[in-house]
């Protein structure tokens, strides 16, 4: 019994610092380097969370790499948009992490011009997309969006589009004629 207690206490003292170092290694906050964005990478969870406090385009977002989902909460529209993330087009979680570590954004291909069209259907059960997405969007209507194929002409008023900029290499447009957007 004494050995069990001693090994448990030793395990706590040995494991706790190593787990703390792992947490620091996998979570890279970026404060103010790109205007008002704060970026948090949780590599273990496979998620990137973004907060942009720009008064002209305030939004929060989650890139869920494990489930290939992206969600954006657009504050001035009081709505959330949920879409499938095309992993072939988006920088990998590792690329974003390396870019934050090295501030080497110029080496990553631009995704400017990706356009998502908001569909009129609401997301009825946010819980199925995970707790972070549910918590972000629980107080606002959440709509599905679909990525437009490159070169496809939009039959949407360009004034209905909202631009989301992540770092310097990812620009997205969310367009739609849905209430709130």
Swiss-Prot record:
Signal peptide interval: 1-20
Subcellular location: Secreted
Coiled coil: none
Chief location category: secreted
UniProt keyword annotation of Signal present: yes
Example GO biological process: regulation of cell population proliferation
Record-linked InterPro entries: BRICHOS_dom (IPR007084), Gastrokine (IPR051772)
Alphabetic keyword roster: Disulfide bond, Secreted, Signal
Source organism superkingdom: Eukaryota
A GO CC term assigned to this protein in UniProt: extracellular space
Sequence ranges assigned to domain BRICHOS in this UniProt record: 53-145
Repeat recorded as keyword: no
Record-annotated disulphide pairs: 80-137
Gene3D superfamilies linked to this entry: 3.30.390.150
Similarity comment: Belongs to the gastrokine family.
Protein task: May inhibit gastric epithelial cell proliferation.
Protein name per the record: Gastrokine-3
């Amino acid at each position: 019994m004494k050995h069990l207690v001693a090994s448990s206490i030793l395990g706590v003292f040995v494991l706790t610092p190593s787990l703390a170092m792992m947490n620091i290694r996998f979570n890279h906050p970026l404060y103010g380097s790109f205007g008002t964005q704060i970026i948090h990478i949780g590599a273990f969870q496979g998620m990137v969370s973004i907060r942009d406090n720009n008064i002209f385009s305030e939004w929060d977002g989650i890139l869920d790499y494990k489930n290939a989902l992206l969600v954006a909460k657009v504050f001035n529209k009081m709505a959330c948009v949920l879409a499938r993330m095309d992993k072939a087009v988006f920088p990998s979680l590792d690329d974003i992490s390396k870019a934050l570590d090295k501030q080497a954004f110029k080496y990553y291909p631009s995704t400017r011009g990706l356009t998502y069209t908001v569909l009129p259907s609401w997301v009825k059960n946010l819980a199925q997309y995970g707790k972070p997405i549910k918590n972000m969007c629980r107080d606002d209507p959440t709509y599905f969006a679909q990525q437009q194929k490159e070169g496809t002409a939009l039959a949407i008023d360009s004034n209905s589009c909202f631009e989301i900029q992540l770092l310097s290499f990812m620009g997205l447009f969310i367009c739609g004629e849905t209430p709130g957007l």
